[in-house]
Amino acid sequence: MNHIIIHDRAGLNQFYAKVYAFVGLGIGLSALVSGLMLTVFQSQLVYLLMQGRLWLTIATFAELALVFVASSMASRNSPAALPVFLLYSVLNGFTLSFVVAFYTPGTVLSAFVSSALLFFVMAAVGIFTKKDLSGIGRAMMAALIGLLIAMVVNIFLASGFFDYMISVAMVLVFSGLIAWDNQKIRLAYEQSQGRVATGWVVSMALSIYLDFINLFLSILRIFGRND
């Protein structure tokens, strides 16, 4: 029995490592593209910013389309799921540069470090807790929908305080989702007895990637209120 437990634990650790390899690759690509836009292609970025929100709007809609395509391909275990996820990561790095450009490097670094620390804590909660987090996960998803509606409303209100409260709530929501999504990785492994299709690995990596990026953006808005 001990040998079986050790084997299962080793297999689960390898499975987490595989998921997080994809997550790390996605975040790395986004950071690389965003960094290049802010340095090597800074003049082009300034030009695009001066053109208004057209390019950002186009890129945002393209991102949404890629998320749906990647999720659909992952659910069908399509070999194209991983390339689409990586393409999304590249495009997201492009759009992130539009946001990050308005903050100081110190603020961006502080937000990233804080996001990483909070992410690792909540990921550990999801990985090691024995409590079923599905109820919390569903509540966080419902709260996220409400916050997205609030963000749309605040486009017209243009309230700085309202935006701050939304950002704080977003941090709480994505912290909960990070724990839940990490628990789902373990459950997927256990329920499939370690035979999880690559498409599902990509799907879980996409969820974790989105959790981290949105957590970072929420903390960045909080830290950068005075920038």
Model-assigned labels for residue ranges:
Residues 1-227:
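A hydrophobic alpha-helical transmembrane-helix feature that marks the membrane cores
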